[in-house]
From Swiss-Prot:
GO terms for molecular function: ATP binding; ATP-dependent protein folding chaperone; isomerase activity; unfolded protein binding. GO terms for cellular component: cytoplasm. This is Chaperonin GroEL. It holds the Pfam family Cpn60_TCP1. Together with its co-chaperonin GroES, plays an essential role in assisting protein folding. The GroEL-GroES system forms a nano-cage that allows encapsulation of the non-native substrate proteins and provides a physical environment optimized to promote and accelerate protein folding. The gene is groEL. Forms a cylinder of 14 subunits composed of two heptameric rings stacked back-to-back. Interacts with the co-chaperonin GroES. GO terms for biological process: protein refolding. PROSITE patterns: CHAPERONINS_CPN60. SUPFAM superfamilies: GroEL apical domain-like (SSF52029), GroEL equatorial domain-like (SSF48592), GroEL-intermediate domain like (SSF54849). It comes from Staphylococcus saprophyticus subsp. saprophyticus (strain ATCC 15305 / DSM 20229 / NCIMB 8711 / NCTC 7292 / S-41). Its EC number is 5.6.1.7. It catalyses: ATP + H2O + a folded polypeptide = ADP + phosphate + an unfolded polypeptide. It is an enzyme of class 5 (isomerase). Signal peptide: none annotated.
Amino acid sequence: MAKDLKFSEDARQSMLRGVDKLANAVKVTIGPKGRNVVLDKEYTSPLITNDGVTIAKEIELEDPYENMGAKLVQEVANKTNEIAGDGTTTATVLAQAMIQEGLKNVTSGANPVGLRQGIDKAVEVAIEALHEISQNVDNKNEIAQVGSISAADEEIGKYISEAMEKVGNDGVITIEESSGFNTELEVVEGMQFDRGYQSPYMVTDSDKMVADLERPYILITDKKISSFQDILPLLEQVVQSNRPILIVADDVEGDALTNIVLNRMRGTFTAVAVKAPGFGDRRKAMLEDLAILTGAQVITDDLGLELKEATMDMLGTANKAEITKDNTTVVDGDGDQNSIDARVSQIKAQIEETDSEFDKEKLQERLAKLAGGVAVIKVGAASETELKERKLRIEDALNSTRAAVEEGIVAGGGTAFMNIYEKVAKIEAEGDIATGINIVLKALEAPVRQIAENAGLEGSIIVERLKNADIGVGFNAATNEWVNMLEAGIVDPTKVTRSSLQHAASVAAMFLTTEAVVANIPEESNNDAQAGMGGMPGMM
């Protein structure tokens, strides 16, 4: 494919147009009085949202050079979302401000490499200053405040706070769509996995089609159980205890399944068989998790164990097990707490080591099931369009809350950037490095300026007053009042604020040091070529 090239100022200006188009679409959403953006969807109703990363991902420009500029800012939003889960609009506003200011200086003759050094130096000092003014999140109310500010909805903040209180900071909180109008919180305690009973005849409640087992024994194996004789000696001992048994195996089939069902129907004993969760190595790990949680031993060839030789002390126990057609939940397992804590530490170490997002997600799910449980926020709304928009806001709020618990909080509404302004301004430097520091200083004003402008106010006036205000005091654009932002509950997670600044600076520095841009020249399609022939006579 042929290529087209642009150099120096021509290249940077072309890309800047793309940066501005994307950033201008995103930045109208920032702040309590930010607007929504409507996104066209090919097969469904339009999506109305104020989520920065969602808007950024949708933008594809026709001009290849403009599109490359837009893609750079998309990268800022994506990276910030990936690390902190929120703050994508702030990152976009910061990136645009740095690129615009930097380009003015490059056009005036500044050396881009010197500017980059200045930007890096300023950001390093800014991040140190952010951590100095950061405060830990200690209680339920502070967690609720973070969620409420991110989602612009107090009710959402309350749900997230309750969910984190019930399943812990490491717990899994999922967001699902509800079929009703109301949003509600549902907490699944204990370990749940997506495998249900192997026969509907195993249920204990035929109305609800659920098998509820009180104080069950739990047999865990990675083997396939085909012969009833293999488990008969163990079942005879379980019958004498007059307690139910949950069998978790690779599969239960043949006369083993038939006899379990027949004995269940005759009332001889209560047994429920479910397939083991996961596949391959993940299955082994999940079975081991369940064994540690319930105090069982996995019957496996790896340990040289046979089902015929299994004894009662190899079985796990729990306070309760609930099995539906699709899920099995084991509540309050009787495993040794020290063993559970050691397993939790092991999984946390694996999370730190892995680079795979998929593996990290699966490890976090396993961690949550061992550490506390799973909370589900079921999102309700009056229409599909509202449902999608509300779900996106809750996802952002949840990510913000987790970030706040991890690294603490700072004053919100762009105030934190102005609180660190003076420290960055005091950095001693000369020449292009000093100019690079000034680029960051100008960018630190941008979020506050944009929030004020979205509220219909003059941003410059708010910025100048903030430069002289005490740390933590800021402008509440929702009420047009000057308040202590932390006391008023207007806060941002430190991690979100830090990530947005770091990623914006990184992309801006790359942009300013760009000297050539190479774009593909689209190939003329066959249809266009044939149309150009004008239907020549004699053609067959």
